[in-house]
Amino acid sequence: MTILTHTLGFPRVGLRRELKKAQESYWAGNSTREALLAVGRELRARHWEQQKQAGIDLLPVGDFAWYDHVLTTSLLLGNVSARHQNNDGSVDIDTLFRIGRGRAPTGEPAAAAEMTKWFNTNYHYIVPEFSKGQQFRLTWTQLLEEVDEALALGHKIKPVLLGPVTYLWLGKVKGEPFDRLTLLKDILPVYQHVLAELAKRGIEWVQIDEPALVLELPQAWLDAFKPAYDALAGQVKLLLTTYFEGVTPNLDTIIALPVQGLHVDLIHGKDDVAELHQRLPVDWLLSAGLINGRNVWRADLTEKYAQINALVGKRALWVASSCSLLHSPIDLSVETRLDTEVKSWFAFALQKCGELALLRDALNSGETAALEEWSAPIQARRHSRRVHNAAVEKRLAAITAQDSQRENPYEVRAEAQRARFKLPAWPTTTIGSFPQTTEIRGLRLDFKKGNLDANNYHTGIAEHIKQAIIEQERLGLDVLVHGEAERNDMVEYFGEHLDGFVFTQNGWVQSYGSRCVKPPVVIGDISRPAPITVEWAKYAQSLTDKPVKGMLTGPVTILCWSFPREDVTRETIAKQIALALRDEVADLEAAGIGIIQIDEPALREGLPLRRSDWDAYLEWGVEAFRINAAVAKDETQIHTHMCYCEFNDIMDSIAALDADVITIETSRSDMELLESFEAFDYPNEIGPGVYDIHSPNVPSVEWIEALLKKAAQRIPAQRLWVNPDCGLKTRGWPETRAALANMVKAAHNLRQAK
């Protein structure tokens, strides 16, 4: 039984973010649909060939998406809401873009579908919408077309499909309430049709992703798998694919299914390989997810070999990435500025394909010399002086309960803050960033490339900050921000100023749609060598009599949106960051900044996938935030911001953060998220986002007023703030001015209506 390699998916965006550039050019009307489609074809062909050359035996097809693979599945099934449909009922790529972003080059704008995080990753998916009695049919044949492309190129392939039960699990009911699981019988015929078409093309294996099987699912959902897969069986071999956690708790459900193989994540799961082998049907193939698809670290292949070698010859075996390589940058070889030692510790998507090939060859031959050679750098890292800082470790060990307590409770602090700031009812503010214009990006790029000296760079940034203050005063906002012109990314910026991080030139990963991020990498103990944000916050405050918020990214978010170390716990990393940023809060306060926002949009997304593991995570996550914030005096108002959140199941922890003001993303959910705060009787102040910054559509005054009135039915008006859902970095100035003007007008109308 020869062992084969495969990946669960590959990055879509291209080494130079070619897909992003093509999407945005098309959306702006600067290129044709045909040009966009051509870029997609070119990227797919390149990525298949690169994986093949790196040693992958079975190439994934269907992992490419124009916006998001869950959205692609919605179109495949004909699940398009009335507001997004073409007038003639057809489905095309503009339909897809209208669902994802609210508008497209053709068709009428409409509210975008909700977006949320893909399990506990930094990738976002577009939430499917379900209505009672809806019909499904095959309307989008992208998968079949791409299979034809790959076969025409002579590749040995494995199509990828998001499974029907997970697809339903990821969606939400719109309109009349009903159990969306009842739609399973209606979508299965479409899946049967697709599998039949794949069988006609001579496809042997289909990777059918059911990551919901790693969750603690309700029994009704677990029971749904057997009839679903009974209906899908028989046309092709099915590789039931799971990731992000182990499958052992749901293994009884899995082994009853009529599939021919199982993929398990052996990085993030705690499954015992020997137990899996013992319990799986003898004729099943086991796909072992041994190479981490979610990080940038080189694998110790000697450990991976030892983990799986006992199964060689005992059952059909493939070796694979733990999950799709979507979550990893593409190619380490183009990184020319990384220190040689540090670079030797890393492996990006293509290098991970190479790791799989090395592992396959060793398992097939029994020869391990190549594994030992590959693993030597990552083994040597354990003793590197770049990794350990005795002062940081000592400070971390000395943390006491007092370090995470504000001086007085919220009620006392709120009085001091009201006396200091004298804000009106319905105070208006923004979340932090303003549009990152071509001029701002060019300024930063010229400075990084050495084409601009420090003095001219600072002069340029200062001018953009000044303009941001002028714009906000002109609009009539109550609490201002400096606009973050100096920041490329809310995590990368802090990582650049903290010891213990390194950065890549081209380590881009997709966040959503055309948005890509370049996460920093935590390589060692973290400390702050000097103040980070104080200079620009102090300058911005000098330009206005209104309060200007200091803007920090919180410790859990920096952790979650970075590639973390693998040799210490996530708790250790978060608390090291918290101690570093605690010093930043103290310095901002000393510089006269009275409102400090510590963004924690990632707090919820960092939750373990199994609810039984939540308490331990939330305990240290909340403690890290409080360590960061607790140094502030009573009269200093601490804000936090969160997005993409369902709060009802973590309200105790949200309240335990003890932030004076929390701003949250609520507009896409029509203020539904406030139900959690109402039910909990949340005691502090709240800024529910009143418009969706991910869409270029400008909300009307009436729309915003209606949302705020809804909010006031749940939260006392005296504790409500008025703000957008999120930062405005990705928007243009014309739509930003128009939206904020309407937001301020809505707040003024409500003040006058008192």
Curated annotation (Swiss-Prot):
Binding-site positions, 5-methyltetrahydropteroyltri-L-glutamate: 17-20, 117, 515-516, 561, 605
Biological or metabolic pathway of the protein: Amino-acid biosynthesis; L-methionine biosynthesis via de novo pathway; L-methionine from L-homocysteine (MetE route): step 1/1
Cofactor: Zn(2+)
InterPro entries documented for this protein: Cbl-indep_Met_Synth_N (IPR013215), Cobalamin-indep_Met_synthase (IPR006276), Met_Synth_C/arc (IPR002629), UROD/MetE-like_sf (IPR038071)
Binding annotation for Zn(2+): 641, 643, 665, 726
GO biological process, one term: methionine biosynthetic process
Keyword terms: Amino-acid biosynthesis, Metal-binding, Methionine biosynthesis, Methyltransferase, Repeat, Transferase, Zinc
Catalytic residues, chain numbering: 694
Binding site for L-methionine: 431-433, 484, 599
Role description: Catalyzes the transfer of a methyl group from 5-methyltetrahydrofolate to homocysteine resulting in methionine formation.
The name this protein goes by in its record: 5-methyltetrahydropteroyltriglutamate--homocysteine methyltransferase
Species this protein is from: Salmonella newport (strain SL254)
Lineage of the organism: Bacteria, Pseudomonadati, Pseudomonadota, Gammaproteobacteria, Enterobacterales
